[in-house]
């Protein structure tokens, strides 16, 4: 069977909500890593790219109407290169890599770019049309995160718990204490700060150059969401606003962020022809559904499924990149998979609690980080997995080349 390989990848810094990248449209943001991949790989013939596949979770504003195609054109790729946008909410970026890998394995392509983008700062407010003439019953939604235009049948059958409420549900079900969550969040901040100061994160990043109305140029080189000075005392002092006697706080949850990432996925033959060096083989991918109110546990069945497909066990994984939507759900996943809370090979360079979680981009970031870390550790296998709103999980296994 034909195999699919990650040959290169790059991402923007992750911007804080309303921060350094908030002035950049989603389509312009996605164009940045696409353009950089061509610069980094001068032998690559862009005319040979079969498709560009990007994940994006919102698609209600400037990211509407197929942001992948628009970003492809804005990046200067040939008009002959097609682009498509997929939406599996938080899992969109990882799913994009899976789509690219399946195309190669099926013989439907040899060279693709896959990744994801999200500008949560620029997510618009939306309002539906009136149900009847002259109606005064209008409802407006903030599309940054969460439900909008809810189907009443969905609400009746499955509820409309917010993302923090689903994390509260997981914490209650599995008896995950506030203390354990805050300790996990602190480790995320500490590991991320160390990775940033040592230059590990810089290996993944292309700086974003911005010019304001006065012509002043600013170069954004680093992720800006992390808080390296965080202490356990500070985390313990934060309020839990989502439920009486709750445990979910701003400190043990991921951020609302902006960012984009893109990776080159190629067959072995095309990689050689284009002067590309395979770094990781995409072994297998799986998705799974869970109860929407417990969406944070989605990585558990998805991971078990992908391990079964690959004929591997969780103990074969040298690196695990688990998206930290919330400390509660990350801990729930680790415990259900039989892993310790502080496993050194799980998110060794921190995670979304510190880095942030630009929804459509995050899965691509996980794969990029995992492929780098496998080479640093001389490991063989990596697992990338994440929970998904409305009750899903996604998981992918990579093998170092």
UniProtKB/Swiss-Prot annotation:
Coiled coil location: none
Disruption phenotype: Mutants are unable to use phenylacetate as a carbon source.
Catalytic activity: succinyl-CoA + acetyl-CoA = 3-oxoadipyl-CoA + CoA; 2,3-didehydroadipoyl-CoA + acetyl-CoA = 3-oxo-5,6-didehydrosuberyl-CoA + CoA
Source species, domain of life: Bacteria
GO biological process terms on file: 3,4-dihydroxybenzoate catabolic process; DNA damage response; fatty acid beta-oxidation; phenylacetate catabolic process
GO molecular function, one term: acetyl-CoA C-acyltransferase activity
Keywords for this protein: Acyltransferase, Transferase
Induction notes from the record: Activated by cAMP receptor protein (CRP), integration host factor (IHF) and by phenylacetyl-coenzyme A (PA-CoA) that prevents PaaX from binding its target sequences. Inhibited by PaaX.
Alphabetized SUPFAM superfamilies for the sequence: Thiolase-like
Pathway: Aromatic compound metabolism; phenylacetate degradation
Catalytic residues, chain numbering: 90 (acyl-thioester intermediate), 357 (proton acceptor), 387 (proton acceptor)
EC assignment: 2.3.1.174, 2.3.1.223
Stored InterPro entries: PcaF (IPR012793), Thiolase (IPR002155), Thiolase-like (IPR016039), Thiolase_acyl_enz_int_AS (IPR020615), Thiolase_AS (IPR020610), Thiolase_C (IPR020617), Thiolase_CS (IPR020613), Thiolase_N (IPR020616)
Top-level EC class as recorded in UniProt: transferase
Family named by the database record: Belongs to the thiolase-like superfamily. Thiolase family.
Entries under NCBIfam families matching the protein: AcCoA-C-Actrans (TIGR01930), pcaF (TIGR02430), PRK09050.1 (NF006551)
PANTHER family given in the database record: ACETYL-COA C-ACYLTRANSFERASE, ACYLTRANSFERASE RV0859-RELATED
Job of this protein: Catalyzes the thiolytic cleavage of the beta-keto C8 intermediate 3-oxo-5,6-dehydrosuberyl-CoA with CoA to yield the C6 intermediate 2,3-dehydroadipyl-CoA and acetyl-CoA. Besides it catalyzes also the last step of the pathway, in which 3-oxoadipyl-CoA similarly is cleaved to acetyl-CoA and succinyl-CoA.
Record-given protein name: 3-oxoadipyl-CoA/3-oxo-5,6-dehydrosuberyl-CoA thiolase
Record organism: Escherichia coli (strain K12)
Gene name as annotated: paaJ
